[in-house]
Structures are given as C-alpha cells and as structure tokens.
Amino acid sequence: MTTPISPSGTIPDGSEPDRTDSTDSASESSNHRPRGRRHPSGRTAFKAASISCAILAAGAAGVGTRGAANGAWNAGEGAPYELWRQWSAGTSGLRNLVAAATLAANPHNIQPWFFDVNGDSGSAEDSTGSIDLRADPDRVTPLCDPDGRERAAGFGCALYAIEVAARAQGKRAEIEPWPDGASERSDHIARIRVVNDAPPTSREQELATAIPRRHTYRGPFTASAPEQAVLDSLTKAAPDGAQLVWVTEASAVARVGDLYVEATQAIADDTRMSADSFAWFRNDRSQIDAHRDGLTLDCQGLSSTMLVAAKILPAQSREASDDFWVKSTREVHTATARTYGIIRVDDVDNPRNRLDGGRLLQHVHLAATAVGLGLHHMNQVTERIARDAAQDRPDRLSQRWAAITGIPAPQSLLAFRVGHPERAARPSPRRYLDDVVRDAGQ
C-alpha cells in the first residue's frame, strides 16, 4: 500500500476526473472498460495555473527555501540513493549480495531486516560463506499489515535478490529457512550458504543487471497493454512455491479496479490504519537523509514539473494526502491499468508460502524491469481484508475479489499492476549498508 502525498489538493497529475460514481454497484461497474489515455483539458490547465499562482504568492525567497529543503532540484540524488548507483552485478563478495537484498522490494520501504555476514575466511568481503537474514522487530506496520504477510513476503524478495546476485558471481545461494530448529515465527528468517557454482546463464545475468534499475512505478501507463507473450516471459525460470495469475480481460480489469478504489477509500476512512501508513512518509529531504527509508514524493509517479511544485508547496496533512491517494487510485492507477498480476499461494497464513510468494514477486519485478515494463505493487484489497479480520469486522471484499479473479482471498498473497510506463520510475531511499550488515561475532 502506498499513500501519495498531495502536491496541491487537486486531481492527480496526468489524469482527469472520473465521471463514474464510486458508489456504483459491482454489476454496473463490471461494464466499464479501462479508460484510454487522456489529453490535457481546461481543468488540467487550471490546475497548473493554480499551482503557479500559489508558488508566486509564496514569494521567491520562501519558494527557494522550501524547494531546497525538500530536494526539489535533486530528486533521487545524494547519499540515500547511492546504493542504487553503486551496486553492480560484477562486484564480488558477500556484502554485495546483502546490498542486492537491501535493494529488494519491501512493504512501505520499511526495510525490515538486518544481516549477519560470516565469510569463509572470517571477513564480510569474502565471496563465499554464510549470510543470516534476521527481522528487525521495530520495523513493522501493524495496522496496514496486521498478520505480517507483506513483511514476510518482503523477506522472500530479499532472499531472491541474494539468489540472483549470487548467480551473477558464479555462486549459488543455498537457503535454509528458520535454521537451527527455529520456529517459523522466529525473527531468524533464514541462513544462506553461498558456495561456488557454474557461470551464470544469460537469463541470470539479465535478472541481476535489473537489480539496480528495479523501482516501483506509480505513474500512468500508456493505453497499450503488454502482450501475452511478454507476460508469459516474466515467469521464465521463476522460483517454485507460488503461482502468478494474470487478470487481462477488460471487464475483469475494470471490476478489480473498482475494488481497489473501494478498498483505498476504506483505508483512508480508517484513521488509525491511515496513520500507520503515513508514519512512514518522509515529507522533506531532511527526513529522507535522516531515515533513508519510507515513502517519498519522488516515488509517486508525478511528472518532473508536478514533482517540483509538490516539493515547493507546503506539506499536506494526512487527510489531504489520503484524498489525493484515493484520487490517484481512481484516476491514474486503475484508470490506466490494463493488466493485474496476483501472487497465489496455498495459504497466505503459511510462513513458507509467504517467503515463496515474495521470491516470485521479486523475480517478476526484475523480469519486468529487464523488458522495460513498469510495475506497481497494489495490496489495498488484501490489506483491507486482513484489517477487517483482525478487528472481527464484516468482510466486504473477499467474495467479490474471488468472483472476479478466481482466487480465494486466503490464497491471494500479493498483487500488482504492470504496463508500459509513461515516465521513468525514480529510486526510493535505502539505508547505509553498514547499518544493516553485521560481521559475525558482533
């Protein structure tokens, strides 16, 4: 789940208002087709003019101060983003494998991990040895992810990133989940033994090269849907243990989109759940530099012009940000979606299934990046189902979700939209490697 911060309290950039009443019934909305690419209208021009007037009214000095403080002119640059630029598939060593894991997809960019590294000669710079993945108990979103499924899947993403990076080095990562007899609820998630192996295949090299280019894309997609052959290629040489199900039929895509809008509004209306997410927003550059995690304006899929405007204008309240998120979901994310993917497992409550689902998700995102597709993780429906279950409230989404997708909610672990992006995705901040890596014995 991602709650964009509103740049001005207006409609999302690159979109026009949805004329459809959000209270339409499922039967009515099932007749809607994904809407085509829109052209700027009078309202879009008025929005841009309003932003310009607001900036002028703020005064040149104030604009400069806020713009500098919020990183308006250096998006995606500086220390919090160095790992993306520095990582290379050709660099050997266990630390490089951990760096790949740190760049993996994870919920809300909470980066819920740290790693114990034990090289065969006693150094973290060794190319063979062991890596222990451990959960950081302080990095959680207890209301957005009440049963911990997304966090656990994030560990699976990190494990798969290590597997891919190891193969690029001609190594093999042998994963032992919950080692030494640990409980599957233990914070000791896995031990990875890195050993010498055959040279990588071209496919393995392709996936590894995508690691530093993989970013979540939250902007609009073009009207051209990915071809089925391209979608099929995303699961080539994919890890076992989970299944990817595509939703591509136009009416089904529209109905899934309606559920996303409904779930997003329900999250926004849930003050505590909304606050749990908003706590991970880094509203200006000083917060990004201090925390090097969480969600930022840079990653909301805004155009360059709108991003600068959003950073110059004062930060919005949580409520205004939620309003913008709902509009973005309705008028950009679902309106331009042509394809959804769902990670299906046997049981979303099973810890091993969660790891396997995360491994598959990371594979698909890397494969999508390699062929130039944008991918946007969208879990509002399953998050809302889990939240209602945790509060013993009526479940309003599961039956409709299963009817549209053919996947029961207890088997729907994660979901996303994928397509041809209209603009480049920007990187999210990452912590210093030294903050997540511990040499053995520390």
Can you annotate each of these PLM segments?
Residues 2-442:
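Acidic, surface-exposed loops and disordered segments
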